[in-house]
From Swiss-Prot:
One of its GO terms (biological process) is electron transport coupled proton transport. [4Fe-4S] cluster binds at residues 47-48, 112, 142. It is a peripheral membrane protein. Binds 1 [4Fe-4S] cluster. Pfam families: Oxidored_q6. It catalyses: a quinone + NADH + 5 H(+)(in) = a quinol + NAD(+) + 4 H(+)(out). This is NADH-quinone oxidoreductase subunit B. It comes from Rickettsia prowazekii (strain Madrid E). One of its GO terms (molecular function) is 4 iron, 4 sulfur cluster binding. NDH-1 is composed of 14 different subunits. Subunits NuoB, C, D, E, F, and G constitute the peripheral sector of the complex. Keywords: 4Fe-4S, Cell inner membrane, Cell membrane, Iron, Iron-sulfur, Membrane, Metal-binding, NAD, Quinone, Translocase, Transport, Ubiquinone. It is found in: Cell inner membrane. Its cofactor is [4Fe-4S] cluster.
């Protein structure tokens, strides 16, 4: 006769839930916390930056999703690239990305950041910020609305909850 671990878990959960306990895996708790406390850093390069600021204002209020803009890359875990990335700004983008702590994510906002946009064939424009840094979520539009940005951020939250796992390196010394 096989042992039914699922029934045991349900019995244990039902007994503890009514008493204020919650059973979960450490990985799930960490990924939930990471997804619901994103600290974005703005890398506003053009018109899309205005829409990004609007998403943080009182009408859309990104703070209610646990997102608080940080002024320093060392304090943030999400970079929002908003606008036209030129060849001259590309090294600065990479440098700022490298200063961010792990885990870090990148959201590309607008047609120009996604693929060069209207200026795609210009000699001075990088045809997508994904040529410089790895991008997790693309938000289309010229410029995308604040609702589109918030939708992209919610998609990133889902991705973080799905993929983030807790990794412990036993070689680290404190």
């Amino acid at each position: 006769m096989e042992h039914d671990f699922y029934q045991e878990d349900e019995l244990l959960n039902s007994g503890l839930t009514n008493r204020g306990f919650l059973l979960s895996k450490v990985d799930e708790v960490i990924s939930w916390a990471r997804a619901n406390s994103l600290w974005p850093m703005t890398f506003g390069l053009a018109c899309c930056a205005v829409e990004m600021m609007q998403a943080a204002a009182s009408r859309y209020d990104m703070d209610r999703f646990g997102m608080l803009f940080r002024p320093s890359p060392r304090q943030s875990d999400l970079m929002i690239v908003a606008g036209t990335l030129t060849n001259k700004m590309a090294p600065a983008l990479r440098k700022v990305y490298d200063q961010m702590t792990e885990p870090k994510w990148v959201l590309s906002m607008g047609s120009c950041a996604n693929g060069g946009g209207y200026y795609h064939f210009s000699y001075s424009v990088v045809r997508g910020c994904d040529r410089i840094v790895p991008v997790d979520v693309y938000v289309p539009g010229c410029p995308p609305t604040a609702e589109a940005l918030i939708y992209g951020l919610m998609q990133l939250q889902k991705k973080i909850k799905r993929t983030t796992g807790f990794k412990y390196d036993s070689r680290q010394t404190h």
